[in-house]
Amino acid sequence: MKQHVNRYLFRLFGMLLLLAVCPFSAVAADEATEEQEWRDELCQELDRLCASPLFETTQLGLCVYDLTADTMLYTVNARQRMRPASTMKLLTSITALSVLGGSHTFQTTLYHTGAVNNRVLQGDLYVVGGFDPRFGKDDLYAFAEEIKLMGVDSIAGTLYADVSFKDTLRWGEGWCWDDEAERLTPLLYQGKDCFMEQFVRALGEQGIASAGVTGQAVCPADAFYITKRAHAIDQILMPMMKESDNLYAESMFYQLAAQTGVPYASARQAVNYIRSLIRELGYDADLYRIADGSGLSLYTYLTPELEIAFLRYAYQHNPIFTHLYPSLPIAGRDGTLKSRMKRGKAYKNVRAKTGSVSAVASLAGYAQASNDHMLAFCIINQGLVKLKSGRDFQDAVCEVLCR
């Protein structure tokens, strides 16, 4: 009798357990089915877009990755090397945030030699450039005011610019003569190569006389510190990404180069940091060509797959993502995407870096799908006669991703 009761209780417990588990299993099965249907529908829609006659005469590279599920969703020519245009700024910014960190600052520092006698500085001034593209009027006049506070009415020596932060090349490798890019110099005033001229003027407005003699020299190790002005990395990152500012991108690029501690650091040293991260992500750095930090160069060639790898890396590293994501243009709202995707599902649900050079339009970043999955995508259209045709295709892809 006791065995009968035990057997009955065991069967009853099993039935109750099955009833308890089955609803959850059914829900999980339903969710899995919905996920598969979503993926199938997304891929079918992308297939339809990629069947456009546009690609009979142009080249397409497309890669879509589901960051939430950590799986590849869709690819077309994802390993074909193409010109990234300004989506190169993604690799520059992600590498910089990885190497420099979110607390890095862009600094310009003021030093002097000699001593102050009878309100005359019997020595020289040195402005040490740190390639800060945001250095402006307030910063310059703060320098002049600090000198005035030293009790200086006159400078007997020379005003030196220390531009040893980077090499002496004024433009990037492979830039076109008609790009109209700003000159690359470690000492900038409002983004222009006119620092020392404006510094002499600011000193004069503070009542500090000088002979106006300027030159270039490396600041002596025993020079006396006066003050510095600095801007946070986010202050550089926002214009670089939102407005695709090439000068800001090259400044970020050369911050990497300067980490070597070598005077007159070159673009090659910055490239080595990016190549190092490429290898860390499991790719062969020799399969790609990187010439600058902005994407202006004719010599830079990447793949959509590699850009996705960088976007995935940033997403998985919160100290990077918390700086990168807010800096990206928002579809239909701001930056270089302000006038694109102003309606539909993609509106406000896409944050991505745009790119355009002759015959090339690109777009890479993040899209929030309707099922709350975060997607990373990279689209490169190459061989375009009219860039608008590529951008229209990209916007259509984003609309599909956000459905």
Label every model-predicted segment.
Residues 1-36:
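Bacterial Sec-dependent N-terminal signal peptides
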Residues 26-68, 74-81, 143-150, 403:
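Beta-lactamase-like hydrolase cores
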Residues 57-59, 77-79, 85-88, 103-105, ...:
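Extracytoplasmic
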Residues 189-325:
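A small/polar active-site loop signature that marks catalytic segments
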Residues 61-65, 73-75, 124-128, 158-162, ...:
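Soluble periplasmic/extracytoplasmic beta-strand elements of cell-envelope proteins
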Residues 289-403:
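C-terminal soluble interaction/assembly domains
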